[in-house]
């Protein structure tokens, strides 16, 4: 099998719906749709190119499988034509992809991205609070209405019960009490008071054991207190007498003369003691003078 000599690659592309037709369709689509749909057009174009290549390869290979090749020169021509067609298709696909990319870039620059989420207004929190308060008020009103309806439905029963109670009280107050009943109640009250008075015993402190025990305790404590004060006074008097008798004038003179030398003592010892006392006295006087100064 061989391709006819008059046939060209461009003609075959036009017959099989090649890239020339897809280029025109793609330019029309890119002019009609915005830049945000460029990805979908690119994917559809690539799918159409792959489908055309597969269909073309199947159509070109099917006759080769059915018919045996005649000469090696025809096979070489077919392979060269196929390689040329593939190169042309690759070039066209690259051109189409670059064209779509440039269109997409221009559309992104000219138009803002529509897929971005809208900016939240500054007063959204206040609006939410207001909406929440409104909803709570409405819910409270609905609950209040339901409560009022329930109360209204329960009112007749309460009114009936009140009316029955009031009528029974009025009947009880308006009824007349017989005199026999009054007399009987009076007699019962007098008997109860007399029995209560008879049950009460008069308290006699001299005969009461608790009072007697308390009186004995008080007398004992008073006796102990008086005895203690008496003993303390006697002890104090004895101490005073001892002090007066032991510290009379003579005893004091004797205590003063205890430090004096005796007549039997050696005069050297006496002078030595006197000098020591004088030195002690002078040293004490000097210290006192230095402190005063």
Curated annotation (Swiss-Prot):
The record's section on Pfam families has: DUF4606
For region Disordered, the annotated ranges are 1-23, 52-83
Which regions form coiled coils? none
Stretches of Basic and acidic residues bias are at 8-17
- What domain of life does the native source organism fall in? Eukaryota
Spans of biased composition, class Polar residues? 52-71
Q: Which PANTHER family match?
A: CHROMOSOME 8 OPEN READING FRAME 48, EXPRESSED SEQUENCE AI429214
What this protein is called in its record is Uncharacterized protein C8orf48 homolog
| Annotated organism of origin | Mus musculus
């Amino acid at each position: 099998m061989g391709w006819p000599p008059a046939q060209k690659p461009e003609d075959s592309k036009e017959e099989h719906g090649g890239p020339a037709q897809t280029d025109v369709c793609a330019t029309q689509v890119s002019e009609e749709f915005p830049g945000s749909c460029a990805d979908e057009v690119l994917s559809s174009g690539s799918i159409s190119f792959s489908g055309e290549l597969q269909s073309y390869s199947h159509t070109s290979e099917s006759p080769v499988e059915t018919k045996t090749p005649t000469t090696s020169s025809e096979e070489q021509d077919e392979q060269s034509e196929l390689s040329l067609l593939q190169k042309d298709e690759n070039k066209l696909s690259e051109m189409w992809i670059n064209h779509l990319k440039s269109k997409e870039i221009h559309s992104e620059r000219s138009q803002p991205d529509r897929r971005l989420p809208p900016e939240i207004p500054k007063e959204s929190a206040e609006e939410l609070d207001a909406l929440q308060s409104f909803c709570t008020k409405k819910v409270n009103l609905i609950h209040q209405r339901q409560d009022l309806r329930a109360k209204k439905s329960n009112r007749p029963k309460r009114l009936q019960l009140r009316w029955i109670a009031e009528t029974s009280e009025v009947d009880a107050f308006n009824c007349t009490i017989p005199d026999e009943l009054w007399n009987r109640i009076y007699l019962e009250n007098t008997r109860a008071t007399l029995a209560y008075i008879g049950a009460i015993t008069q308290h006699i402190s001299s005969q009461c054991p608790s009072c007697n025990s308390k009186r004995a305790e008080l007398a004992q404590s008073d006796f102990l207190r008086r005895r203690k004060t008496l003993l303390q006074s006697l002890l104090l008097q004895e101490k005073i007498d001892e002090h007066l008798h032991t510290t009379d004038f003579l005893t004091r003179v004797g205590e003063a003369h205890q430090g004096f030398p005796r007549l039997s003592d050696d005069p050297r010892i006496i002078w030595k003691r006197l000098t020591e006392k004088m030195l002690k006295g002078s040293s004490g006087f000097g210290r006192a003078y230095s402190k005063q100064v």
